Amino acid sequence: MLNEIKAKTKERMLKTIQSFHDDIKGVRTGRASASLLDGIVVNIYGGHQKLNQVAGVSVIDNKTLSIKIWDINVVGEVKNAILNANLNLNPVVEGNTIRIALPDLTQETREKLVKLLHQFAENARIAIRNIRRDIMEETEKMKENKEISEDDFHGAKKEIQNITDNNIKKIDGELSIKEKDILNH
């Protein structure tokens, strides 16, 4: 029973960590990264396609991305999707390739990005604590219904807190790395 509680806690918190990781991956640092365009969705073929399903994104140098579009007929839609993504990017079309020269980040922009990172981190911490609360309530009910003993309850409580603390440390560690990356480039 305790192993199930532990596994459930880890699984739910891992999803939160992965979501946080995806959120911060899309935040621009001073260097070009193909992951910057991961969230872009293109309206083509009567539906929505992720950019990486209609084109290959590669990094040319620290400040330039190249997008090789497989179907030349959708170049305009891809360009519009990039423009509408609110990433402050200026795509330049060259045949079936789009080049994006990333502008330098101003100090003000860097500070805004760091603020956004902190917001993502706080949301992830809150989600982790909410998961802890939910699991603790479930464990408390199990104790009240005599499904687990008092000792097992206290052991589970400690284990859940340890898992929570470790996941919050992971969030803080990723935040610190990304923050340094933004401020130092």
From Swiss-Prot:
HAMAP family: RRF (MF_00040). Responsible for the release of ribosomes from messenger RNA at the termination of protein biosynthesis. May increase the efficiency of translation by recycling ribosomes from one round of translation to another. The lineage of its organism: Bacteria, Pseudomonadati, Pseudomonadota, Alphaproteobacteria, Rickettsiales. One of its GO terms (molecular function) is ribosomal large subunit binding. Pfam families: RRF. InterPro entries: Ribosome_recyc_fac, Ribosome_recyc_fac_dom, RRF_sf. It is found in: Cytoplasm. It comes from the Bacteria. The gene is frr. GO terms for cellular component: cytosol. One of its GO terms (biological process) is cytoplasmic translational termination. This is Ribosome-recycling factor. SUPFAM superfamilies: Ribosome recycling factor, RRF. The keyword Translocase does not apply.
